[in-house]
Regions:
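Alpha/beta-hydrolase fold catalytic core
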Residues: 5, 15-16, 22-89, 113-116, ...
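Active-site loop/oxyanion-hole signature of alpha/beta-hydrolase fold enzymes
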Residues: 67-71, 78-84, 113, 123-160, ...
């Protein structure tokens, strides 16, 4: 490991973005996090399609046809050209489990202004892509991303993966090292082998739990991303959309897909991939993404040869929303280095 490159950088800075004011109607509290009583869905909550036809994306969405396990499916993606002078390089942004390409809007704009072509897929099973009931694996997601880059005529790109997308990015870098010009693992999950920590849960049990998901459960699941335990106003739309899926007539199929993906995260660890990654790597994330994240993130950086670690203080799971100035500064510094 090169001593000059491999170092942990702890950044100081303010937490950007205002947090939500107290929502008395739903029982939320900004002072002490979310109230103990179950939260009630706001009056304006409505059904959302799990394939997000009713959610505007920041750039045109295209579709790549694929055949997977006998299913003819479509993989949605955005292919956004540079806004200024092109630098001839491309960046792929891989979303997390609770998200889809749309939430990368601000990141796309920053990268394209810096001269990058930006490719943003919705993995099959997410966003505007098809949602077949089939096996889901990280290797398949990496292969689908590889197929997309091949179709777009790209021989390599910088791969940026957030949350579950960090697991996909890890597997992509392992399987396609020649195509991984750089690797950014951004608040990735899967930092341990969960199979060694808890017994498996049957898929049907996970499915039944998801079928009965409430607004309170959706809110609290996303509130964990923020150190205050409160979802900011700017992020509330993701709570309403995810809850809105449960009101859709298509929720039973979408819930099964989510159950299968959750099983994938448990059954398909990436911890054994890190030592074999050859790409120049940045491990970056908010240091308040759970009590163990700084230690586990350092372990990742120590295991990937030559990796660099950047921890952003006071920030949780979504720094490009919570602390955009620092996050984008560090991302561009790494991509340009």
């Amino acid at each position: 490991m090169t001593g000059g490159w491999h170092r942990a950088v702890l950044l100081s800075g303010l937490l950007f973005g205002s947090l939500a004011a107290s929502r008395a109607a739903s029982g939320q509290s900004t002072a002490g996090g979310v109230a103990a009583t179950p939260l009630v869905a706001p009056a304006d909550a409505k059904a959302f399609s799990p394939t997000l036809e009713d959610v505007p994306y920041p750039y045109p969405v295209h579709f790549l046809p694929l055949t997977l396990y006998g299913h003819e499916v479509r993989m949605a993606y955005m292919d956004v050209p540079p806004a200024g002078a092109a630098n001839g390089r491309a960046v792929v942004l891989l979303h997390g489990m609770n998200f889809y390409g749309e939430y990368w809007a601000s990141t796309i704009d920053v990268l394209r202004q810096a001269g990058f072509r930006v490719i943003v897929p919705d993995q099959v099973g997410f966003g505007r892509s098809s949602k077949p009931i089939m096996p889901y694996t990280l290797s398949d997601m990496a292969a689908n991303t590889h197929a997309l880059l091949h179709t777009l005529g790209l021989s390599n790109a910088a791969i940026v993966g957030h949350s579950m997308g960090g697991m996909v990015a890890t597997r992509f870098a392992l399987l396609y090292p020649g195509e991984t010009e750089r690797l950014v693992l951004y608040n990735q999950i899967g930092l341990t082998d969960a199979r060694l920590q808890r017994p498996p849960t049957p898929t049907d049990q996970v499915y039944k739990q998801l079928l009965g998901e409430t607004y309170d459960q959706v809110y609290r699941g996303l509130a964990r991303y923020f150190p205050t335990g409160v979802v900011p106003d700017s992020f509330q739309k993701y709570v309403l959309r995810q809850y809105g899926w449960t009101l859709s007539g298509n929720w039973p199929q979408a819930a099964m897909v989510r159950a299968l993906v959750q099983q994938m995260v448990y059954e398909d660890p990436v911890v054994y991939d890190w030592a074999h990654i050859k790409s120049k790597t940045l491990e970056i994330g908010g240091d308040k993404d759970g009590p163990d994240f700084p230690t586990l993130a350092k372990h990742v950086a120590d295991t990937i040869p030559g990796a660099r670690l950047v921890l952003i203080p006071g920030v949780g799971h979504v720094p490009h929303v919570q602390s955009p100035d620092i996050f984008f500064r560090e991302l561009l510094k790494f991509l340009r280095s």
